[in-house]
């Protein structure tokens, strides 16, 4: 049931959000979407910093190893913080235009808005990983 709803959110967002506006607001699914997105962007950041990490000489790599961990943690937290900031901004705009609705509803709708980002991350992570493999092979040559 959840998967069908998420597919509808991607393929027919008008219908999905109309149905969603009629239901009781729950933050479970939107939070799960943002959590998955945050995990995926953290993985992507780790892969990207791993590529950059290999460029530096060995004497700097120990210091830069910490950078990979910071990138992993900060992008994970950043995904969740971005959700809150974007929802807050959207709610503020809604208030300016005399919109009605709770912040919880805005937070919920904004969370579902992260769904296409998951699809994008699922496409870009394998590409980034492949690029990492290519860069490692080039360094061995």
Curated annotation (Swiss-Prot):
Compartments reported by the entry: Cell membrane
A Gene Ontology term for the protein's cellular component: plasma membrane
Transmembrane segments: 32-52, 69-89, 109-129
Domain of life: Archaea
Keyword Phosphoprotein: no
Record's bilayer topology term: Multi-pass membrane protein
Keywords for the protein's UniProt record, in alphabetical order: Cell membrane, Membrane, Transmembrane, Transmembrane helix
InterPro entries membership: Yip1_dom
Protein name as annotated: Uncharacterized protein MJ0794
